[in-house]
Amino acid sequence: MLLSPEQFSRLSEYAAYSRRKLKDMLSDFQQDGKFYSYLSVDGQTINIDGFRAFLIDYFGADLPSDLVDQLFLSFSKPPIKERRTSLFEDAISTVRAKFSESLSGRMAGLNIAGGSGQQTDRSQSSEPQALVCIPEDDVMGPRVANNDSQEPRIPLKPLICTLSLLEADTPENKLDVVFHVYDSDGNGFLDKSEIDGIIEQMMNVARYQQWDTIELEQVIRQMMVDIDYDNDGIVSFDEWRRGGLTNIPLLVLLGFDTEMKEDGSHVWRLRHFTKPTYCNACCSILVGWGGKQGLSCSLCKYTVHERCVRSAATNCIRTYSSRQQDKLYHHWQDANATAKCVKCKATVGVFQGKGCRWCHNYVHHRCMSALAQECDLGALVHHILPPTHIFPAFLERKTSTSLKNHNFSSHSASLLQAVSPSNDCRPLLVLVNPKSGGKQGVKILQKFEYLLNPRQVYDLSKTGPEPGLQLFSTLKNCNILVCGGDGTIGWVLESMDKMTFPHGRPPVAVLPLGTGNDLARCLRWGGGYENENLHKILEQIEKSSLIDMDRWQIKIEITENKSARRASEKGDTPPYSIINNYFSIGVDASIAHRFHVMREKFPEKFNSRMRNKLWYFELGTSETLSSSCKNLHEQIDILCDGESIDLGQDASLEGIALLNIPSIYGGSNLWGRSRKSKGRMPGLFPMKNAEKMQLQTRVQDIGDGLIELVGLESAMQMGQIKAGVRGARRLSQCSTVVIQTHKSFPMQIDGEPWMQPPCIIQITHKNQAKMLVAAAPRKRSSWMLLKRQSTNDDN
């Protein structure tokens, strides 16, 4: 069995939306479970109907039939035969075979222990054994199901283990799942055939991730032999957990996430290098043929071969101080690649100098005496929280803030306290949502962990924003960088509302990773991250300015009795109680709601910004033809600052929107540009027309305590607004809004849609959040361009 990289990627996208835990679902395969009827008599295989029902229950969505069929076929196939190899590859295979023979003596001892007295034909055979997850007859032979039908079936073990790789769980729990799944006889031990299944699973992971597997198989086999600590030929559960948690390659190859457990311990990830790089342990070059070439620490870039990881020095950075100290010294490591010397500016050859993890400077061995021992943190000193300013909370320190009034969570960050640097630095708290922007979030997380102190960088999908906010709450001067979409920003701001900041609420900058990124656009951070250099983004944060942004409280009260409501008008739960960007009812929310439903059902079709925009265009076209929200004024009443708004005046509306920022739908300005105010003769125009003219001159400001109300005529008008040729109809600018709906309407808050039954909506001002605005880009005048052109021509 082997999934293609595309199938594995599609499964990963669905897993991001799953709410179930695989470990909890294993009980459903027991005799009283809902999936038991789909199993074969021996409980080892499952039919296509059970496979489909299990996937729907696990992912919480109907997977496309083509994907289900492809997955079922992949799991039912035996291992794919290798392609015809070249002479060079044949030579390598010969070397691997000889190396395998040297290990055959130790591997022969891995068979079933005396108690059971049963062995499979495969374990007794002297022929080379195929690396499959279960015995070959279980995969290829026909199964007699509970209903005595002859139908295609797939082995259950590879399915469970493959899905376990997609879950965000602790290594301990994942190791438990793998052990119990492959312990087919349930005796608490892994015999040779069961270990072969685990090895094949690890090789599959290597193929999914397109790693270099030339020498990987022998490394894995040697590793599995070493886990058998008592050399009795079988691996117990205790040996499995002990070996799994202490052998980093095993965790990586099983697809498990490695966490930063103790200071000084490396956090490994497999990596491919674009330039010649050498192993820090054996000092030989890392060689690979297009695949991953070695294990590299995400925190300090210490790099080794897979086979050398056990001999790697435990010399990673210390992210906090276990005792009171004020000076930070360089953290030197041997230069395993070429770089420039910070002193003499000459090239530092491989292992001819050292590099500091904190200031990222390299220096020759001969130049080290001329360099100060104390580290100044280099070019990023403004953003780094030094480890000397993070220490255990129980340590008393004169410069620290009292902890008596702080309620710490159970997270490890609650055991640490941070103090502000004495200089003018503003340490940066980085909160990353790895689910935003495809794979961009994961890469940004790893890069920031290396550029800054890893204690400053948090994965929101694992910890949420609270641990990082709690650690930084005691700092006098700090900034926050949210890497994600508009929903991620709202999540962080709402978490900040629940906390106390003794020195004032820190300002927030945005690195846009979402689809619309409207808040990032109006704060000049751009419409999306385009792989810019993170050093430049940190420079922009350092030069940014402060602004206050209004935030609005929304309360929704259902007016109709739930029992009297029709089944077709069943509503959803509102996603937020606070408006940061906008709130809308009608045509635009209808398109967004249909987009949201489609994305949850087929997430693999929404994996890029361009494809998302095309889907919006298609759904907008269908909404134009259907006009599902026409005659909106007949079903909605609105009061702005106590005055009723006539929605039926002039053209009929199909939607309304309340705007807090001047960007919506990925950069559209619904309020539009304001006209210049002109004087008029008193009494020349009626009062209503005068108020309408005055409304056209009002300017939108995100910090004026006012929210703007506009009307949308149709989906076609939304396209015209997006093109910049037209604006929405201005209705009001006010500080309080009350809306009553008389039927179910699609609604959305900050891009998160839902279907809302008849209700009364109250919107009031909540507070203001401090945000960072990027500096306006410099405009090059035509004179400067002409001058530069003439200068170049002269040269």
Curated annotation (Swiss-Prot):
A family per Pfam: EF-hand_7
Binding positions for Ca(2+) 2 per the UniProt entry: D228, D230, D232, E239
Any single GO BP term: regulation of long-term neuronal synaptic plasticity
SUPFAM superfamilies: Cysteine-rich domain (SSF57889), EF-hand (SSF47473), NAD kinase/diacylglycerol kinase-like (SSF111331)
EC class name: transferase
Any one Gene Ontology cellular component term annotated for this protein: plasma membrane
Occurrences of domain EF-hand (ranges): 170-205, 215-250
Zinc fingers classed as Phorbol-ester/DAG-type: ranges: 265-316, 329-375
Residue ranges annotated for the DAGKc domain, each copy included: 423-558
Keyword terms of this UniProt record: ATP-binding, Calcium, Kinase, Metal-binding, Nucleotide-binding, Repeat, Transferase, Zinc, Zinc-finger
Catalytic reaction equation(s): a 1,2-diacyl-sn-glycerol + ATP = a 1,2-diacyl-sn-glycero-3-phosphate + ADP + H(+)
GO molecular function: ATP binding; ATP-dependent diacylglycerol kinase activity; calcium ion binding; zinc ion binding
Keyword Metal-binding: yes
Disruption-associated phenotype: Slow to adapt to new temperature levels. Dgk-3 and dgk-1 double mutant shows defects in olfactory adaptation.
Coiled-coil regions, chain positions: none
Highest taxon in the source lineage: Eukaryota
UniProt binding sites for Ca(2+) 1: D183, D185, N187, E194
EC code: 2.7.1.107
Assembly: Monomer.
Function: Involved in AFD-neuron mediated thermotaxis. Regulates behavior to environmental temperature. Thought to have a role in olfactory adaptation by affecting diacylglycerol levels.
Family to which the UniProt record says this protein belongs: Belongs to the eukaryotic diacylglycerol kinase family.
Protein name: Probable diacylglycerol kinase 3
Protein's organism: Caenorhabditis elegans
